Amino acid sequence: MTDLVALEHIAVAFGRKAVLHDISFTLRHGHILTLLSPNGAGKSTLVWVVLSLIAPDARTIRRQPKLRVGYVPQKIHIDPTLPLTVERFMRLHPGVKKGDIGPALARVQAQHLHQAPMQKLSGGEMQWVLLARALLNSPQLLVLDEPTQGVDVNGQVALYDLIDNLRHTLGYGVLMVSHDLHLVMAKIDEMLCLNRHICCSGTPEVVSAHPDFIAMFGYRESSQLAIYRHHHNHRHDLQGEVMPAAQPHGECRHD
């Protein structure tokens, strides 16, 4: 499995405040890694390091040459008075042609939003549009910062199905960042629990039972960690509704 980004013993401090200490992990082709941590534990800073937006104080970082990265931000603010359709928003991406937009939206089952006003999108629709935009440069690595924020449970299930499909069909490496314990994707390859340093790592089942994880989130909260497993034989749309049987779910993989 090809390494896309490898971090070894990363440390970041802002002034005298240590934000990250001794962080090591590897993002690989076809590999899904979830970073789970409470607010204020350094996860945004770590995302910036992965995206090369800040340089750590202590570092060994190896990247695949000419690595293409697609980024889905935690949120995006758009002036409500700005007349901006989904198509025009996606064309703001450098080098994008009009003909690139339809296929990107279709890949995430959002082609019907092509001419929709950005300001009128639901939380789930906005996430799908941001994901489609991240796919425009044919990335090798997807970085998703709180991708389920503002999305209901059915929408989260649909998003997890899509991410799993993308990594299998296109071989993307995926870094997902979250502070939400309510629903975690079971098919991730590795979960890291972060609180300025990596407290524990492993599968969701292993991490959820780790003493450091329980100490960080509390017994009550950590015991509520829900792991989503794909057991259905149908597909959800952007709103979480079951799609008609006439639309095949041939890309689906079952446990």
Swiss-Prot record:
PROSITE patterns on file: ABC_TRANSPORTER_2, ZNUC
GO BP term (any one): response to zinc ion
Sorted UniProt keywords: ATP-binding, Cell inner membrane, Cell membrane, Ion transport, Membrane, Nucleotide-binding, Translocase, Transport, Zinc, Zinc transport
SUPFAM superfamilies associated with the record: P-loop containing nucleoside triphosphate hydrolases (SSF52540)
Subcellular location per the Swiss-Prot or TrEMBL entry: Cell inner membrane
Domain ABC transporter: 5-220
Quaternary structure (record): The complex is composed of two ATP-binding proteins (ZnuC), two transmembrane proteins (ZnuB) and a solute-binding protein (ZnuA).
Protein name per its UniProtKB record: Zinc import ATP-binding protein ZnuC
